[in-house]
Every structure is written in structure tokens, then in C-alpha cells.
Amino acid sequence: MVHLKLETLRLNDEDQSTGSSLITPSRTQLCDEVVRWWKEEPAAEDMLIDTLYEHLIRRRSNWSVTKDELYQALKSHKLYTPELNELDSYTGDIRPSTVTDADIAQLNKKLLDKVTIADTEFGKGLVATDDIRKGGLVFHEQLPLTVIPQLDKQPLVSRGKCCGLCSAFTTLSSQLIIKNNLDCNMCNTIWCSKQCKKLDTTHSVLKHATSRNSLCNSSNWIKFENFCLQESLVAAYAVGVIYARHVMQPTSNLWKLFTSLCSVSQRVRWQASDSINVGGTFDASCNGKLYADVSAPNMETQWSDAFEMFAKSFPKCDMDYEDFLNLTGTFNLNQIMGQVYPLVAHINHSCEPNVRYELEPKHGIKLYARKDIKKGEQLRLTYVNPLHGVTLRRRELRVNYGFLCHCPRCCQEWEKRQKIVSDPSNHAISSEAAHSSTTARRKSSMKSCRPSLKELLENGDEFDLEIPSDVNSKRRMSVRFNSHVTLAVEEE
């Protein structure tokens, strides 16, 4: 006869500290915890400081912190700001794009069948040159400016587990690889297709120490690549790949297009993201890695070291350190999922977008209309998760792109939030009432602009699924997780 014994285990991502000792968190730790919570539960962003404090103490019962300390920490990092003018942006530091229709036409004239690059109130943007019906294809960029391999998969690439260019996991048999000449004769690198091998024009000069190309030192490149991997310097690595392709194909317009895109120094972005402390939670260039213990001077040293290795990799490069910082900023401002698509890069942001994109398995990107677009209307994408509240959206936009969004949705949500925060009578609202009220307002404001689940899945971006607010208590408990999990263990 089989008996079942219930065992309760601790989740391996839980804080394993035990005992009654309390921890005094730093301001950075406080802010990072709140930001992570907001990303998990976007409705919590609109909670009043009293309610926010109550929930934080429940989440981190081993933390010793007062409500005022929490408030001051959030305020110092512009996360709980009563006045919009207290939020700094670096729009004035961004050099606008100088790319023209003629530059894009050199890549593919068909890209401009329905759109044109034009000056708008927000700088260069894409404007429809014809009416576009909802769901219609606007354009299709078949390739990015140059395909940039995924940095975090390079160890697998070196062992022949991933494609040397697109970084896709390979399932090809040895016979098929040899038959189609998809392997490298000098190392373990393989490619998943003939197209990827053809596009990987820099493999031999970057990866083989026997290369005699005077423009690139492969031994130093490998050191540079490993350093970028260790420190998660994705943008620096991307600039290196783009420059290497330019060196190998100097007659192409690759470098001209890349350096003509809008640009800002990476140093400016550090400052906007609070020296990569709490801002690291938002900073897309951090690749999800938080730098809670990295100060601005240390970041400067880190990037200076990266540039020194970059310069040694390309002995004849006349680029200086400031140029390098500007180019890494260029990549961060214009990239989508680690690739640079020069036409898509000109689409400005709105929290109520009228277009969406689909990434293709093999490098391409397609742009579709989310609603009817009239001739002369500007195309708009959302740069951030549209399910988040106005504070989180604006914070993420400020850190990554240097501006504060003033679209109708942001203005309406901000105005409502400020009325609640500034009214002393609202601080007496209970936790549940405040949570329900802010959730209802958020759902109402997003009703017309929320993307469908199909769109979110197609775009491949991170998104949040909300817990329904109208379920009974039994149902709610069935979907709520805590720090433990109970398993049924079979016993004989």
C-alpha cells in the first residue's frame, strides 16, 4: 500500500536567513526591492507611502526600516516624486539622428513604400506616406544593420553548441553539418545555416589566433570579449562587433548608418540611472544584472578597461575613449532585442502605440499597424511594458532613453496619482481599499491601449499577467505563492 507524506520545502530563491536578527537595508536595497515588487505587481506602484510601507515590511520581515526612511530612499531616487519638474532627463544631451531616406534606400527601397523619415516635434520620426489599415504590414527589415551574436552564449558557441552568428541552439547532425560545410576548419564553431555562415564575415579574424590581418588582433579580441561577458557589457561588445564588420567591409554604409543614428554618451546614462544602482533595475543595457555595489567611479574604470582592450583589438583604430562611450550609448538608444534596425530605430514612443513589431527567427523584423493610420500620421511604438503604471514607465524611459513621456495617458494617470498623494485624507485609506482603487483606475486608463496577449507573445517582450480581482478567496489562495512549496512524496 502506498502512503503519501507531505513535505514542506523552502524555495531556493528565498532569503535563507533565519533567526531574529534584523537587517538594516541601504537606500539602494530598499529601492531595488520596491522596483522588483512593482514589476511583479504593477498596481502596487500607485500605493500611498503608508500602504507601501506595510506591504514592504510583510515582504521583508527581517528588515529594520522606518516609514520615513523608506520615503526618503524612494524620493532620493525619484521613485516617489510629488512634482514632475523634479524628474531629470537627458534629452538635451542626445544628438539627433542624421539618417535620411536616401540612406535607407541604399539598403532597400521597398522599406519606404509607406513611410518616410521626417522631422517631428520629438526629433526624427517615421511618418506614414499613405493610409495604412489596421493589421496591415508597414514594412519588413529582413536584416539588422549587422547581426550581433548573443554575448552570453559565446561559451556555448566556442563548444559548437550554438550557431556562431545567430546564437540559436543547433540540433543538426554531424553528417548534415559536414555535408553542407557548416563547420569551421580551425575551431569548434558551427553555423545553423548557409546564410548565417555567409553573414559571419568576421569569424576568422576575430576567433583565430593564426589570422594575420593587421586590422584586428584576435588574441586581444578574445580578452575583450571575455571581459564584456564577465561584466555584462553587452553594448561594448556590440560596438566591437559592428566595428569589426566595418573594418572587413569598409565600402559598405554600415558604419555611416550606425554613427548617424541618435547618440548619447554612456556616461550620461550612468548618471540618469543613479550610477547603475537602483537605475540598474531599469537599465536595459545592464542585461538584467544589478550593480547595487558599483559606484560611478568604478563604472568609469570598468568602461575604461573595456576601451583599452577594444583599442588593442583594433591597433589601427583612431577612436578615443569618448567616442567609444558615445557609440555604446548609440547602441543602447537604438537597439531592439540586441539588434539595430535602422528604420525601426526612428519610430518614436507612445504609451498608446499605433504599430507593433514581430521579430522573425532569422534576423528580420516586421512592423504592423495596431490601428488604422492616416497619411501624414506619425508611427509610434511603446518602448516599455504598457502594463506598468506611469511612475514605472516614466522612470524606465528616463533611464534608457532620456525623456519623460507626456502622452495623454501618462498625463492623465500622473494627474490622478498626484491628487491622491497630495491629499492628506487619502492616507487613512486601508491597504485593501487603496489597492482596489488604484487597480481600478489603472485598468480603466489602459482599456483602449492594452496590447492583446497575442501581440505580447509575438513581440517576445517581458510582460505581466494580472491576478483577477473578482475571484473568491478560495480561488485566490490557489494561485498565490509564498516562500514555501508543499510536495507529495510517495512512500512504500
UniProtKB/Swiss-Prot annotation:
Subcellular location: Nucleus; Chromosome; Cytoplasm
SUPFAM superfamilies associated with the record: SET domain
Catalysed reactions listed for this entry: L-lysyl-[histone] + S-adenosyl-L-methionine = N(6)-methyl-L-lysyl-[histone] + S-adenosyl-L-homocysteine + H(+)
Enzyme class: transferase
GO biological process: methylation; negative regulation of gene expression, epigenetic
Keyword S-adenosyl-L-methionine: yes
Compositional bias segments (type: Polar residues): 425-439
Pfam family, one: SET
Record-linked InterPro entries: SET_dom, SET_dom_sf
Span of domain SET: 113-384
Gene Ontology MF term list: histone H4K20 methyltransferase activity
EC number per UniProt: 2.1.1.-
Region described as Disordered: 425-448
Keywords annotated in UniProt: Chromosome, Cytoplasm, Methyltransferase, Nucleus, S-adenosyl-L-methionine, Transferase
One Gene Ontology term, aspect cellular component: nucleus
Domain of life from the UniProt record: Eukaryota
PROSITE patterns in the record: SET (PS50280)
Entry annotated with the keyword Methyltransferase: yes
Protein family according to the UniProt entry: Belongs to the class V-like SAM-binding methyltransferase superfamily. Histone-lysine methyltransferase family. SET5 subfamily.
Biological role: Histone methyltransferase that monomethylates 'Lys-5', 'Lys-8' and 'Lys-12' of histone H4 (H4K5me1, H4K8me1 and H4K12me1, respectively), thereby controlling gene expression and remodeling chromatin structures.
Name recorded for this polypeptide: Histone-lysine N-methyltransferase SET5
Organism: Kluyveromyces lactis (strain ATCC 8585 / CBS 2359 / DSM 70799 / NBRC 1267 / NRRL Y-1140 / WM37) (Yeast)
